[in-house]
């Protein structure tokens, strides 16, 4: 393991960071040891201030405390074997395990030394967002907002340790892990068209349930169809602004005030255990294969090795679990709305607009240095954003580009964007995923009062149902960067395009 150069002053560190334009910065070789490619990150002035403040704090305490700023993590990823292009940080980047959250990197599958790293995916494999539209207007919902919020809260199990109500045994779980949304469709928890509007059509074909440990399966079995805690939520939202009416209409959005439901959840304890198991195995693989990294949290294995392949197959199975999970909650949300409005989900036009992953690694084809290459793209805290006419996006969105779902923080707006050709060439067809933390969870708990946060949401006209009220401080808007700045930076940088904005009217949290 190489040690970071902790003796440089803040001013000396700044010599390695160069502003390219108003929205992007280059990290030069030498910023951390062993960099094989340069780094790149996107930020406007307010976000830039947060990035550099983090670096300045790191320099002032001489790196003591184990905390690494996002820019250093971008540099450490740029030192990994087999990386191509650049190590890229998005505007919502913040410090994470191994990779920063909001850090993307691609590795050349043809290079026998290229690696896969669980830290480049995260512990909540396929944590992601699904957006469901309705034909309801805000005026239809407002008189019964509290009833609807309670109905959603009653239907969807939430919170730490919550247990699902989808009946499942060990055999069902193995089938769900391998079949993804095809299992949901077979069991009657999804509509056929839901799959069409889902990244990977809701199923990663390389999934192998045999690569999931018994402990991971035991954690996952009771949790299917549950929201969980932390930053996971189900929100009833109203369309607040439409920026691109052509693209919005292709998604069934045609007026301000139209009601949507956003579900944000992942692979629960199963995905966490898959990552934990893989990290243990990869630390041994690194010794065996002589792999050196700057940060031991970047534990990795050669893509082609047994350890690398086992992780990718297990990760794919965990991703399938997450898609089944969001499909199960879609089923429950449809039931809740149908019950409240005394009609059917079909009559309410409760169709899935799209479902995206924010934590995943996938083999894709991209142009690097003018040559088409097969790459393993790690997206951690970031969203795939493929452009118009890309073969992997649905027919409905061929003219507009892939919908990109950007969740805000509790009580703030969310956005839908679309993928662009510029994003395809600059960021491997990837953009931001949300607001990105500005305060650590511990600092948020120390500095905020949960009752004040809840009162402020109520004063804003937002109905809220929370399983663990004291966890609310961790997810308060003050704990995060401004999602509007993040989205605007991506839009102005050209890596994705604004389509419409959503405003919360009811929030369900763990």
From Swiss-Prot:
What is its EC class? ligase
What is the reaction catalyzed? a 3'-end 3'-phospho-ribonucleotide-RNA + a 5'-end dephospho-ribonucleoside-RNA + GTP = a ribonucleotidyl-ribonucleotide-RNA + GMP + diphosphate; a 3'-end 2',3'-cyclophospho-ribonucleotide-RNA + a 5'-end dephospho-ribonucleoside-RNA + GTP + H2O = a ribonucleotidyl-ribonucleotide-RNA + GMP + diphosphate + H(+)
The record, for InterPro entries, names: RtcB (IPR001233), RtcB-like_sf (IPR036025), RtcB_euk (IPR027513)
List the GO biological process terms.
tRNA splicing, via endonucleolytic cleavage and ligation
For the ligand (Mn(2+) 2), the binding residues are 127, 264, 358
Name the residues annotated as catalytic in the UniProt entry: 433
Cofactor(s) annotated in UniProt: Mn(2+)
Enzyme Commission code: 6.5.1.8
> Is Nucleus one of the keywords UniProt gives this record?
no
| Residues engaged in binding Mn(2+) 1 | 124, 127, 232
Q: Which PROSITE patterns match?
A: UPF0027
Entry GO MF terms: GTP binding; metal ion binding; RNA ligase (GTP) activity
Keyword set, alphabetical order: GTP-binding, Ligase, Manganese, Metal-binding, Nucleotide-binding, tRNA processing
Q: Where does the chain bind GMP? A: 231-235, 358-359, 407-410, 414, 433-436, 509
GO CC terms:
nucleus; tRNA-splicing ligase complex
> What binding details are noted for the cofactor?
Binds 2 manganese ions per subunit.
More about this protein: Ligation probably proceeds through 3 nucleotidyl transfer steps, with 2',3'-cyclic phosphate termini being hydrolyzed to 3'-P termini in a step that precedes 3'-P activation with GMP. In the first nucleotidyl transfer step, RTCB reacts with GTP to form a covalent RTCB-histidine-GMP intermediate with release of PPi; in the second step, the GMP moiety is transferred to the RNA 3'-P; in the third step, the 5'-OH from the opposite RNA strand attacks the activated 3'-P to form a 3',5'-phosphodiester bond and release GMP.
Task: State the function annotated in the UniProt record.
Answer: Catalytic subunit of the tRNA-splicing ligase complex that acts by directly joining spliced tRNA halves to mature-sized tRNAs by incorporating the precursor-derived splice junction phosphate into the mature tRNA as a canonical 3',5'-phosphodiester. May act as an RNA ligase with broad substrate specificity, and may function toward other RNAs.
SUBUNIT field: Catalytic component of the tRNA-splicing ligase complex.
What family is this?
Answer: Belongs to the RtcB family.
Q: What protein name applies here? A: RNA-splicing ligase RtcB homolog
